Amino acid sequence: DEAAVEKVAHLRFPDPAPCGKTPLRAAGLSKAYGSLEVFAGVDLAIDRGSRVVVLGLNGAGKTTLLRLLGGVEEPDSGEVIPGHGLKIGYYAQEHETIDTDLTVVENLRRAAPGMDDTQVRSVLGSFLFSGSDADKPARVLSGGEKTRLALAMLVVSSANVLLLDEPTNNLDPASREEILGALGTFTGAVVLVTHDEGAVEALNPDRGLLLP
């Protein structure tokens, strides 16, 4: 895999789609699973271009918060309020944004319907899916390959708010550096959940949200 690692292209996220001053807000979010209350009364405003890192112990509900913000789950109370022009890019730690019934290239086409085949394959090449790799069914991908595909889908989405749940897990060192470099130059808003101190450094957050 050494040769493959050498080929990681210099990634950059495209310019985010235009949006209002506060593309995403949450008010009074609460969530419980059965009798287990995950969190209650969470308020959050994500301004255009802001960088927020979500902190908290394991089980504090960091992943759950991103799922609520991304519309994957509904809160028990409170609301998520989309602002003008909101376009979310959600990176799920469990890769559930990937459709395992589709091939790698079909997943990327779905994420960027406006791109032609040459552009799609070029993006996949920069994420180390070249030639026949791009035509593999997503269900046979390794954890690291799924991470690379999910990140490729984010890159083409022109999202203006990225919700990232442990985006550097399963990545080889060279790919991790590229992703962190791309995040550092991204001009949209980012909400990051991570145990990777290097990722927090690269993001250079404006603030942290501490879940109890």
Positions of PLM-derived features:
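ABC-family P-loop ATPase nucleotide-binding domain
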Residues: 1-25
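ABC ATP-binding cassette signature C-motif
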Residues: 16-212
